[in-house]
Amino acid sequence: MEGIIVINKPKGITSFDVIRKLKKFLKTKKIGHTGTLDPLAIGVMLVCVGKATKLASDLEAKDKVYIADFDIGYATDTYDIEGKKIAENIIEVSKENLEQSLKKFIGNIKQVPPMYSAIKIDGNKLYHLARKGIEVERPERDITIEYINLLDFKDNKAKIETKVSKGCYIRSLIYDIGQDLGTYATMTALQRKQVGEYSLENSYSLEQIEEMTLNNNFKFLKTIEEIFSYDKYNLQTEKEFILYKNGNTVKIKENLENKKYRIYFQDEFIGLANIENNNLLKGYKYY
C-alpha cells in the first residue's frame, strides 16, 4: 500500500495520534506526516504511506493557507490560548491600526520560532527545554508571507487568513503582530485550510478513513501523479536510467524549462529531479 492521504485533523489530538490511528486502520507501519499540527489546530494534514514517505520533504515544502483567531492584549508562554498567561497590556486597537500592522508582515521576512516547538537546538527539542523553564536564543528563520487578510475584528478579537511558506509559525506571527501594535497577541484558534493545491474539500476525516478501509475502499489514497503537479519527463535510455538512479547528472537532448519534474522510465515513476541549464537533469528524490 502506498500513496498520500489528505486528512482533516480534528481538534484535541496530536499529529502523532493521527499517524497512530492510521497505522491501525491501514495495518501498515510505514506512515509519516508532512508538517505538524498542534492539538489546538484543525484542518489539512498530508500523510504519506509506504514508498511515498520518501517524498515527504517535497510535500512539506508546499505553501500553506491558514485561518487564525487571536486576542489582542495578553501573551502566554506558548503564544496560544492553551498556555499560561505571562503578560497583559490592554490597549484600544482600531481596525485601521491592525490592518496597517498586518501589511508590515507581508513578503520575505525574518521570524523567531516559539520556544514551544519541535525545533532542535544543540540536540534538544525546544519544547522540552521550555517545559523545564529554560529559554534559549533561537536563530531567525527566513519565511515568506504571500498575504494576510483581516476577516473579522471586534473588541480586540481578530480573525485572519494568511498564505505562508514552509517554516512559518502562525503563533509567532500573531505574537509579533501584537508586539508591533505595542502590546501582546495570543492565538485562540487555528485551521489549516490548504497545503499546496490540496484543501479541506479534498480531505477525509479519520472516521471516514476507518469506515472506508473496513469496506476495502481505498480511494482516499492519492497517487504520486495526483499529488505532484510537476511536469512529466521520461528518461529515454537504459544509460540515462542508470545514471539517474546512481545520483549522477543526466545530460538530456531536449531543452527544457529549469524547474522540477516527475521522472519516469518505461512509463514507471522513479523519482523527482531538477532541470538546470535547460538540459542537465539532477535527481533529488528517488522512488
Curated annotation (Swiss-Prot):
Pfam families: TruB_C_2 (PF16198), TruB_N (PF01509). GO terms for biological process: mRNA pseudouridine synthesis; tRNA modification; tRNA pseudouridine synthesis. Keywords: Isomerase, tRNA processing. Belongs to the pseudouridine synthase TruB family. Type 1 subfamily. One of its GO terms (molecular function) is tRNA pseudouridine(55) synthase activity. Gene3D superfamilies: Pseudouridine synthase. It comes from Fusobacterium nucleatum subsp. nucleatum (strain ATCC 25586 / DSM 15643 / BCRC 10681 / CIP 101130 / JCM 8532 / KCTC 2640 / LMG 13131 / VPI 4355). The active site is at D38. The gene is truB. It comes from the Bacteria. The keyword tRNA processing applies. Responsible for synthesis of pseudouridine from uracil-55 in the psi GC loop of transfer RNAs. Its EC number is 5.4.99.25. This is tRNA pseudouridine synthase B.
